[in-house]
Amino acid sequence: MTIEICKKLHVLIVEARFYDGISDALLTGAVSTLQKAEATYDIVTVPGALEIPGAIAFAEKNSKIYYDGYVALGCVIRGETYHFEIVANDSCRALMDLTIHKHLAIGNGILTVENEKQAWARAKQDEKNKGGFAAQAALCMIALKKRFGEIIKYG
């Protein structure tokens, strides 16, 4: 996507702050990518990964601001209970449902990892930079959506 196209884009970043430091690293990567693309953005914060899809749905349905796309940022670290599977699966499924059923361009940067070491390796901008990757994915999906037209019809 060219910078001229990106300059006209406005993106909403929805970040879960359950792990503050990891969230900061993911956000830094996402913001850096959007700034390099010269896209504008807003940021909202939610308590955890399960709340991210709801925030995106609220913004899409009720916001007076139009967002071309969304970046979902958060981290789910496996614990001793089944809660990890619920949060990891349901947050991802809800984002996919928004993409498929509401035709939203979403970059998914919700980390699902075994431990904090894996989370840091994926969150840091100088390592795997998954926040930046999620922002880039959102920009790519926005471009694809625009290529096929804002109104997508399924045959």
Curated annotation (Swiss-Prot):
Binding-site residues, (2S)-2-hydroxy-3-oxobutyl phosphate: E80, T81, R122
GO terms for cellular component: cytosol; riboflavin synthase complex
InterPro entries: LS, LS/RS, LS/RS_sf
Keywords associated with the record: Riboflavin biosynthesis, Transferase
Pathway assigned in UniProt: Cofactor biosynthesis; riboflavin biosynthesis; riboflavin from 2-hydroxy-3-oxobutyl phosphate and 5-amino-6-(D-ribitylamino)uracil: step 1/2
Residue positions of the active site: H83 (proton donor)
Biological processes, Gene Ontology terms: riboflavin biosynthetic process
Pfam families: DMRL_synthase
Residues reported in the UniProt entry to bind 5-amino-6-(D-ribitylamino)uracil: F18, A49, L50, E51, C75, V76, I77, N108
Superkingdom per UniProt: Bacteria
Gene Ontology MF, one: 6,7-dimethyl-8-ribityllumazine synthase activity
Known function: Catalyzes the formation of 6,7-dimethyl-8-ribityllumazine by condensation of 5-amino-6-(D-ribitylamino)uracil with 3,4-dihydroxy-2-butanone 4-phosphate. This is the penultimate step in the biosynthesis of riboflavin.
Family, per entry: Belongs to the DMRL synthase family.
Entries under NCBIfam families matching the protein: lumazine-synth (TIGR00114), PRK00061.2-2 (NF000814)
Protein name: 6,7-dimethyl-8-ribityllumazine synthase
